[in-house]
Amino acid sequence: MAIERTLSIIKPDAVAKNVIGQIYARFEAAGLKIAAARMIHLSRAEAEQFYAVHKERPFFKDLVDFMISGPVMVQALEGENAVLKNRELMGATDPKKAAPGTIRADFADSIDANAVHGSDAAETAQVEVAFFFPGLNIYSR
């Protein structure tokens, strides 16, 4: 198994609930290491650029509005099968359909305010990690 990196964002709803530490504990318990992390308040332009793949979708404006509504915690996670492992930890996009014990089942309020974002594939992860952590500020351990 290869070591991968993936991007995770703890969204404004979960940051406001003060559950960052509980979510980090789940990453670490699953064998994922936090290789880089920072808290930021996205600008509209940053959110639109990051979610540009969804630009033509009907939910794009609401997604951008939500993502700029408060600070987010962004982290690059590293470990074996990091992309899949993080997606399993997150659970289904709709928290009502998320398996019990997943991050979204435990901390999300709705399909929009669903606590976390995670890269959906290794290729996407590379682009997303580079978006938030350009250069050499990621540290393998």
Swiss-Prot record:
The keyword Kinase applies. Keywords: ATP-binding, Cytoplasm, Kinase, Magnesium, Metal-binding, Nucleotide metabolism, Nucleotide-binding, Phosphoprotein, Transferase. Homotetramer. The gene is ndk. Belongs to the NDK family. GO terms for biological process: CTP biosynthetic process; GTP biosynthetic process; UTP biosynthetic process. The keyword Phosphoprotein applies. One of its GO terms (molecular function) is ATP binding. It is found in: Cytoplasm. The active site is at H117 (pros-phosphohistidine intermediate). This is Nucleoside diphosphate kinase. Disulfide bonds: none annotated. Signal peptide: none annotated. One of its GO terms (cellular component) is cytoplasm. It catalyses: a 2'-deoxyribonucleoside 5'-diphosphate + ATP = a 2'-deoxyribonucleoside 5'-triphosphate + ADP; a ribonucleoside 5'-diphosphate + ATP = a ribonucleoside 5'-triphosphate + ADP. SUPFAM superfamilies: Nucleoside diphosphate kinase, NDK. ATP binds at K11, F59, R87, T93, R104, N114. It is an enzyme of class 2 (transferase). Its cofactor is Mg(2+). Its EC number is 2.7.4.6. PANTHER family: NUCLEOSIDE DIPHOSPHATE KINASE, NUCLEOSIDE DIPHOSPHATE KINASE DDB_G0292928-RELATED. InterPro entries: NDK-like_dom (IPR034907), NDK-like_dom_sf (IPR036850), Nucleoside_diP_kinase (IPR001564). Major role in the synthesis of nucleoside triphosphates other than ATP. The ATP gamma phosphate is transferred to the NDP beta phosphate via a ping-pong mechanism, using a phosphorylated active-site intermediate.
